[in-house]
Amino acid sequence: MATLRIGTLGAARITPPALIKPARSVEGVEVVAVAARDRARAEKFASKHGIRRVVDSYEALIADPDVDVIYNPLPNGLHGAWTVAALEAGKHVLCEKPFTANADEARAVAGVAESSGLVVMEAFHYRYHPVAQRMIDVVRSGEIGELTHVESAMCIPLPLPKDIRYRLDLAGGATMDTGCYAIHMNRMVAGAEPEVVSAKARIAKPGVDRWMQAQFRYPSGVTGTMTTALWSSTLLKVSVRAVGTLGELRVFNPTGPQMGYRMSVRVGGSKRRITVDGAKKATYAYQLEAFAAAVRDGAPVLTPPADAIANMTVIDAVYRAAGLPIREPSMRGT
């Protein structure tokens, strides 16, 4: 089996847990090169994480014949342009969430991906973990009855106003950064695409949300609530609640279950705790295994460009409903 050689764009904080660490445990995968705007930073990053080569520019990394896959953890507004550049150079792409700045850009990237025949995966790592599949299985099993409502939350403490996630020119904001997870989980559990009924935001700076809550309605009549924050009185909340006609499913920390999670079903007066085999294995390891299988064997991708379009469509609608601007792609030189 030939080694799948991965090059990473930038020296982002997410790269070690999301790519470098799992690559050490996934057979036939190696992170072989890194490129960053600041070569000194790239060299320090490469030395720290055992990456053999530092490449002078993003363009050079994408053109490198000894790289098969590009990992794209750049700021949100740069995801689309650099994913397209990588695809046009014949590289498979693992792109961090959110996939693009908006739904129109997602559709454009998806068109390039489809014509290329290459693997493109949006890095919703939690979706590849067995805890996510168990959530779906419980809801679809009918144990809690007919689904009526889904609540999802992704709130983290990020009080640093200079963090790039608060930059409108880089397509920042809570709904883009953490809300994309809460929206994705809501859609996953409901198994459908929602209409955004209403949304309200709290603002960090002009046009940029630090907190957002949205109300959804699905075609079946199921309702949904999504709450997300980078800074609010709810410092940390990562959860899903699915309500049915007979009971409810509650899950704590579905996006990082390897660090600890709780899953329970309550029906009538009884409560059942659910444990999931393989839960201690990292979401990122499952994701990288799935990506490698897609490249090598044509295995299905659970978070393909089509799913990214659907998620970005909801994100755009949430911003519209809250009276905030839809994000725009950043210039590649940003």
PLM regions and their residue ranges:
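N-terminal Rossmann-like dinucleotide-binding module
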Residues: M1-H49
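Contiguous beta-strand/loop segments that form the cofactor/metal-binding neighborhood of enzyme cores
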Residues: H184-P257, G278, A285-G298, R332-G333
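Hydrophobic residues in well-ordered beta-strands that form the structural core
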Residues: T15, V55, L94-C95, V120-E122, ...
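Beta-loop-alpha module in the N-terminal Rossmann-like domain of NAD(P)-dependent dehydrogenases
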Residues: H49-G111
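C-terminal helix-rich "cap/oligomerization" subdomain common to oxidoreductases
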Residues: M1-T3, V69-Y71, P219, A290-T334
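Rossmann-fold dehydrogenase core element
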Residues: A108-Y126, E146-H149
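Predominantly a Rossmann-like dinucleotide-binding segment in NAD(P)-dependent oxidoreductases
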Residues: Y126-K205, P325
